[in-house]
Amino acid sequence: MIKGNSFPKTSRLLVNSQFRTVMAKRLSARDELLVLYACESGLDYPRIGISIGKSCGNAVIRNRLKRLLREAFRQNKHLVTPGFDFVVSMSPQWVRQTRGRKDAKTVVGAIKLAQIRDSFLKLAAQLTSGRA
C-alpha cells in the first residue's frame, strides 16, 4: 500500500461535536451532486466527515455513496488545502431526483468515482481559495 494514500482515523471527523463545529461555521458550497461544508482546523492535514441521510435511499445505496466519497477523498487528499475540516453530504437536488425511484440502485450505480472526485475537489477549492 502506498503510505500517502491511507485513510487513518486522524483523517476523519468521528464525533458529533466535530461535525457540529464544521456546520456552525456556515462556510458551504454546493453543486448538483454534493454539499460541502468547511472550516479551518489548524491541523497540517485535511479531515473529512460524511453525512448521508436516510432520504438518500436504503442502506445499500447509502453505504455505496459513503464508500465513493471516502475513496474520492482518500485518493485526492493531497490536492486539498491542508488545515481544513470538511463535512460532505449529497445535494438535496440529487436526493429529490432519486427519491422514490424504482431504479434508485441503478442511478447510484451509475455515479462514477470520477464524478464524486471532480465535484468534491471543485467545491473544496471554492471554499479554501484565499484561505490557509
Placement of each model-derived feature along the sequence:
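Positively charged, solvent-exposed patches that mediate nucleic-acid binding
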Residues: 1-132
